[in-house]
């Protein structure tokens, strides 16, 4: 700042504060100067005299400033730049590195979460406590949610953790999308969303690992029906009805999947039924889970002795049973039978809830019929297949809800 000849060079408090508070390329000087008087054009602004805001050191500068000076002087171009500037717009959310592998033979989708870099700080210390969670879309729920461990106080976490979906079919690969979300864990309040990536599974080829290193994106919430215009609501309803019509009236609601193992033992003269595991079961309890168990019947059951059931698995939608049941029967007789498998939610003091079921036998269709036929044609060979559970309750099974 220039003064009269012989005067000591001084810097007023406004300039001193502006210098200290304006580091880096963020350039907030324009915003800070709104609260301090600025030297305007004219004779006061140049030469040897003091202008507005250049007060003696023993006086408060703001007290001498006129109201107009407190508002600051910005050009239209400057004002437009400030209005359009948003620090979040230029803040990277970070990148996520991971591998995906679809194992067609075992019907599994493997997702190895490797690392993230440059995550957005979420905590007061400028760091985050990140973890990754997976969902399959459409139909995101607790049944298909997988989650990594939390890495503490880092913006560059390394997980190297593998998460696996079971019971994935070729139809899932064609139609479903994997949503990978990175969140910040907060023990004192709700966890915070950082960013996400959505990968259509059709980009995967069976048994070929695919590597990804992608920038995270913001979550784009879909508009609620109440916020849509009448025209958009009408179009949405029309498309939904059209989709239901294309699917057909006979389509049953999917309630999860079950992995069954069938083997006819020629030495023991009977059928071995293995209940291996279930995946993505429907939640039947208020806590968002179920307490599932499995029952099997071999119909027609003249002696009513064909019922078997597994133990109950508490609070899970992806139970592992690994239990085996044996039905003593000649192969020729077995060819006329139907194996009914139902999954139930165990409740104390009231009727158990039916989750879903599947029937395997000569009258079945699709994969269920093929599984039964392969079992009969390949004695002494265990044949494992995943089956979709539907909401159709077998007539005979409905009479035993408490068992």
From Swiss-Prot:
GO molecular function annotation: calcium-dependent phospholipid binding; metal ion binding
Domain C2: 92-214, 254-387
Record bears the keyword Repeat: yes
UniProt xrefs under SMART domains: C2
Any single Pfam family the record assigns to this protein: C2
Top-level taxonomic group: Eukaryota
GO CC annotations, alphabetized: extrinsic component of synaptic vesicle membrane; glutamatergic synapse; lysosome; neuron projection; synapse
Residues annotated for Ca(2+) 1 binding in this entry: 123, 129, 184, 186
Disulfide bonds: none
InterPro entries: C2_dom (IPR000008), C2_domain_sf (IPR035892), Doc2 (IPR014638), Rabphilin/DOC2/Noc2 (IPR043566), Rabphilin_Doc2_C2A (IPR047022), Synaptotagmin (IPR001565)
Subcellular location: Cytoplasmic vesicle, Secretory vesicle, Synaptic vesicle membrane; Synapse, Synaptosome; Lysosome
Bilayer topology term: Peripheral membrane protein
GO BP annotation list: calcium-dependent activation of synaptic vesicle fusion; positive regulation of calcium ion-dependent exocytosis; regulation of calcium ion-dependent exocytosis; spontaneous neurotransmitter secretion; synaptic vesicle exocytosis
Domains (record comment): C2 domain 1 is involved in binding calcium and phospholipids.
Entry function: Calcium sensor which most probably regulates fusion of vesicles with membranes. Binds calcium and phospholipids. May be involved in calcium dependent neurotransmitter release through the interaction with UNC13A. May be involved in calcium-dependent spontaneous release of neurotransmitter in absence of action potentials in neuronal cells. Regulates Ca(2+)-dependent secretory lysosome exocytosis in mast cells.
Annotated protein name in UniProt: Double C2-like domain-containing protein alpha
UniProt organism field: Rattus norvegicus
Gene (UniProt): Doc2a
